[in-house]
Amino acid sequence: MSAHCQVTGRKPGFGKSVSHSHVRTNRRWDPNIQRKTYYLPSEGRRITLTVSAKGIKTIDRDGIEAVVARLRARGEKI
């Protein structure tokens, strides 16, 4: 499972970890990605989305139907 939110488009951030002695090593900051299953009443079926915590809040605020409509308008296959 890739660390990519289908709703918000959030991806990992990349940078450096800096130790006490200032040695820099590569690291990445992963978004809080969850696999969530939602029921689409208009289609009578469930869909599974890979969403971040902010994406879950967006779905709670706007509704799953509106979010799925935006995803399909963007060309994403659901």
Swiss-Prot record:
Spell out the GO cellular component terms annotated for this protein, sorted alphabetically and separated by semicolons: ribonucleoprotein complex; ribosome
Say which family it is in.
Answer: Belongs to the bacterial ribosomal protein bL28 family.
Species name for this entry? Nocardia farcinica (strain IFM 10152)
MF term (GO), any: structural constituent of ribosome
Query: Where is the organism placed in the taxonomic lineage, from the top?
Result: Bacteria, Bacillati, Actinomycetota, Actinomycetes, Mycobacteriales
In its keyword annotation, does this UniProt entry include Ribosomal protein? yes
The reply on keyword Ribosomal protein is yes
* Biological process per Gene Ontology, one example term: translation
Gene that this polypeptide is encoded by: rpmB2
* Region feature Disordered, mapped onto this chain: 1-28
Q: What is this protein called?
A: Large ribosomal subunit protein bL28B
Q: Which UniProt keywords apply?
A: Ribonucleoprotein, Ribosomal protein
Q: Which NCBIfam families does the protein's record reference?
A: L28 (TIGR00009)
Top-level division of the source organism's lineage = Bacteria
